Amino acid sequence: MDKTTIIVVDDSPFASKQIKDLVEENGYEVIGYAKSGEEGIKMYEELHLDIVILDIIMPGIDGIETAEILEKSDPDVTILMLSSLCDTGTLEEVRAIGVKYLIPKPWEDDVLLATLELLKKHKEENKKEDNN
């Protein structure tokens, strides 16, 4: 089976490297980083990969607006959001745009990996349904 491909959209190079190291040790492939929402949108449109790991707080357009743009351009996009803002209002805002998973920063490695596994399985199930 092909590796699940991921881009990390986070303005923190340190966080991006931590995520890359963790997920690649566990069978995923990080094929790019973006430091802003604008870069992340462009990268996704060029590569159409499996999962976008997206921070909320970034310069320029934030993660919520980035997710809205990605969802409008590709309703099948799979997004995992990370943020130090995990209050009820933020969670409701994230869900309203169709993102199902928001993990608090700093994240627990096992939670991040378990969530990626759920997203991967969900994406595989959708592909099977589309092929039937």
Can you describe what each PLM-predicted range is?
Residues 36-39, 62-65:
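Acidic catalytic/metal-coordinating carboxylates
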Residues 47-53:
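Active-site beta3 strand of CheY-like receiver
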Residues 65, 86-103:
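Alpha4 helix (beta4-alpha4-beta5 surface) of REC/receiver domains from two-component response regulators
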Residues 58:
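Receiver (REC) domain active-site loop signature in two-component systems and cognate sites
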Residues 117-132:
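The C-terminal output helix
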Residues 13-32:
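Two-component/phosphorelay signaling modules centered on CheY-like receiver
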Residues 89, 107-117:
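C-terminal output helix
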